[in-house]
């Protein structure tokens, strides 16, 4: 397996913010890198902890959403959702599944922690 290929795919998805495309498809990545479905799946299985393509993209979206919620308090949750390729309800659902709390609950905890300092 070629870890350099996976690193390149991951870097491009992040730097070009491809994850923010609501309808990003596996085929878009396959075409961009000239690889087949099986090869992409092998890359994900080997270097992305066996995630499916949608799981992998959602994991990146969650990382970015977490960072934006933490470091950009001026952004609304709806703005953050759009920024990462979700609707606000999708972000709420995925964030709660991933972190055990909603984005609003997470942000409220940040704000109250700042008030206590």
Which positions does each model-derived feature cover?
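General nucleic-acid-binding
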Residues: 1-34, 38
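Weak global preference for isoleucine
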Residues: 9-13, 29, 35, 57-60, ...
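Basic/polar phosphate-binding segments, predominantly the helix-turn-helix DNA-binding elements
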Residues: 27-55, 81-102
């Amino acid at each position: 397996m070629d870890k350099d290929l996976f690193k390149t795919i991951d870097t491009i998805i992040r730097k070009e913010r491809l994850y923010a495309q609501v309808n990003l498809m596996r085929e878009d990545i396959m075409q961009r890198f000239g690889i087949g479905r099986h090869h992409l799946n092998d890359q994900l299985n080997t270097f992305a902890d066996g995630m499916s393509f949608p799981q992998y993209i959602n994991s990146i979206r969650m990382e970015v959403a977490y960072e934006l919620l933490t470091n950009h308090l001026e952004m609304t949750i709806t703005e953050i959702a759009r920024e990462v390729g979700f609707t606000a309800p999708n972000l709420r659902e995925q964030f709660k599944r991933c972190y055990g709390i909603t984005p609003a609950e997470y942000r409220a905890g940040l704000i109250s922690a700042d008030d206590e300092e």
